[in-house]
Amino acid sequence: MSKVAIDLAGVKKSFGDKLVVNGLSFTVASGECFGLLGPNGAGKSTIARMLLGMTVPDAGKITVLGEPVGARSRLARKSIGVVPQFDNLDQEFTVRENLLVFGRYFGMSTRKIKEVIPSLLEFARLESKADARVGELSGGMKRRLTLARALINDPQLLVMDEPTTGLDPHARHLIWERLRFLLARGKTIILTTHFMEEAERLCDRLCVLEHGRKLAEGSPHALIEEHIGCQVIEIFGGNPQELVSLIRPYVQRVEVSGETLFCYTADPEQVRVQLRGRAGLRLLERPPSLEDVFLRLTGREMEK
């Protein structure tokens, strides 16, 4: 059995009258990427802060890298790299200086930090920007620098809160490629995200959250098979209620979201036959995704 990097058992957290994390339990094995997937307000960032000992749970137990959070979280933090949701780089320092200053927080000698900086710059693809001030960098470059900074102490575990929020598609894909590089070298990653594609591409397993409660847990493929398991046809245009009556006999399930119909079927051609000749309709046929799982679990309006 894989060594456990993170273990949560029955964790609860409230702020005032608001229950933010509701009896959450999960484990993360060493060397895997585990995702916390949920909308804003699902409790993802609070969970990340509790893992780091920055927020104290009201109930339950958290163990990180074999150390109980709270009593010995400072010891575990020495082997953890953190990528916060919003970059907190020193804008007046250069790229190189940001890495140098951050390394000192871990008690590293200046000589040691200078030894590792070139490899971190290469990893982040910032070699040509080493002496540029942070304020001169693009959003994607800043994010890669924040990731490189989190690796200054060669951590066993990376805790990443919404790592690609605000990035354009090219910058996002570059971050994903760098994270896959780290996973291939045995790092453990726990990340919070609301990007379905990010979770599907990176995560070995994930936990779907809503209002601090776990709705499902498993690999992306297993969750898709369990909760969807067939082709999806999105239908735009027309009267949704009229279309539901027409196609219901030919689908396993049909859901309505606004003016869009989501049909789940093993026989897409039958659906197309029934809708043939109807003006004003647009159809999109695609394989199921985590977004379908997420929307089903968290409450898209469902046609009974």
Swiss-Prot record:
Pfam families reported for this sequence: ABC_tran
Positions annotated to bind ATP: G38, P39, N40, G41, A42, G43, K44, S45
Alphabetically ordered keywords of this record: ATP-binding, Cell inner membrane, Cell membrane, Membrane, Nodulation, Nucleotide-binding, Translocase, Transport
A GO cellular component entry from the record: plasma membrane
EC code(s) of this entry: 7.6.2.-
Residue ranges of every copy of the ABC transporter domain listed in the record: 6-236
MF GO annotations: ATP binding; ATP hydrolysis activity; transmembrane transporter activity
Membrane topology of this protein: Peripheral membrane protein
Superkingdom field: Bacteria
Coiled coil: none
InterPro entries tied to this protein: AAA+_ATPase (IPR003593), ABC_transporter-like_ATP-bd (IPR003439), ABC_transporter-like_CS (IPR017871), ABC_transporter_ATP-binding (IPR050763), ABC_transptNodI (IPR005978), P-loop_NTPase (IPR027417)
EC main group: translocase
PROSITE patterns per the UniProt record, alphabetical: ABC_TRANSPORTER_1 (PS00211), ABC_TRANSPORTER_2 (PS50893), NODI (PS51240)
Family named by the database record: Belongs to the ABC transporter superfamily. Lipooligosaccharide exporter (TC 3.A.1.102) family.
Record-linked PANTHER family: ABC TRANSPORTER ATP-BINDING PROTEIN, ABC TRANSPORTER ATP-BINDING PROTEIN NATA
Function: Part of the ABC transporter complex NodIJ involved in the export of the nodulation factors (Nod factors), the bacterial signal molecules that induce symbiosis and subsequent nodulation induction. Nod factors are LCO (lipo-chitin oligosaccharide), a modified beta-1,4-linked N-acetylglucosamine oligosaccharide. This subunit is responsible for energy coupling to the transport system.
Designated name of the protein: Nod factor export ATP-binding protein I
Organism: Rhizobium sp. (strain N33)
